[in-house]
């Protein structure tokens, strides 16, 4: 059952000023969120882009989170703040109806005798918790998870079903790990002996800070000697690969299907778009934005926006451009020849 909150509680939670219309009070109850177009009685919506102002004027929402410049266009109660999208996120947290990944400790879970469990820990059916593991207060371990030897999981961290944490992995507080993610598998470390690959045991681990979120089916490899480190507040989308010995700075965001090769250091507050490939053994400074489909082959030491992806165009135009690209070296040589003849 969804919880309800009053408009005043909601305004206090998100840091907004409350403007009431006739018939509403600070005690008017809100039970859920919806879009401007579909919201109704007891629901709250938001407007963060003035392009949707026409929907604001017609909405049947109980209240709307918006900027002060949009207040005059609102026919219902309003929660006014500078960043309505952040307000929406905070309101969604308050009204979150997402279930727990586990309730209580299932009798079907396999838990080693020396595991340290904090208060209110939940472990789902068929989860395996190996020796030396420490689970802090309010940790949720979903069904089918594997928690390897000497893993440490911080308070309020939640693992959805079928997450794997290899031995000695460390997760901080308030982390969220989505299903089928693997943290702490071996990094891709091999030496070549006359054509034969010799495996290098990966002796480091993976350390996640506080408030780290990792999407479904992502992989973060353990370090070869030093550790792979994911800083506080980092968010990683689905199906990403983070190789061994990578260091990711605080509050960096990485979108889906991105690959970060080994021994890369990414700074703080970076945004990495989807399907980006980052070559190994390089540094990316703080406050860098890399657009989707880019390939990063050298270090970035200056904050800013970087791109190298090829946007889609009509096939006929692309084929013409491909022919021109194939002939580029010939055209370049012809230009040089013409320049030399002109100088004579």
From Swiss-Prot:
One of its GO terms (molecular function) is N-acyltransferase activity. The keyword Glycoprotein does not apply. The keyword Repeat applies. It comes from the Bacteria. The active site is at residue 244. Its EC number is 2.3.1.191. Homotrimer. NCBIfam families: lipid_A_lpxD, PRK00892.1. PANTHER family: UDP-3-O-ACYLGLUCOSAMINE N-ACYLTRANSFERASE (PTHR43378), UDP-3-O-ACYLGLUCOSAMINE N-ACYLTRANSFERASE 1, MITOCHONDRIAL-RELATED (PTHR43378:SF2). This is UDP-3-O-acylglucosamine N-acyltransferase. It comes from Pseudoalteromonas atlantica (strain T6c / ATCC BAA-1087). The lineage of its organism: Bacteria, Pseudomonadati, Pseudomonadota, Gammaproteobacteria, Alteromonadales.
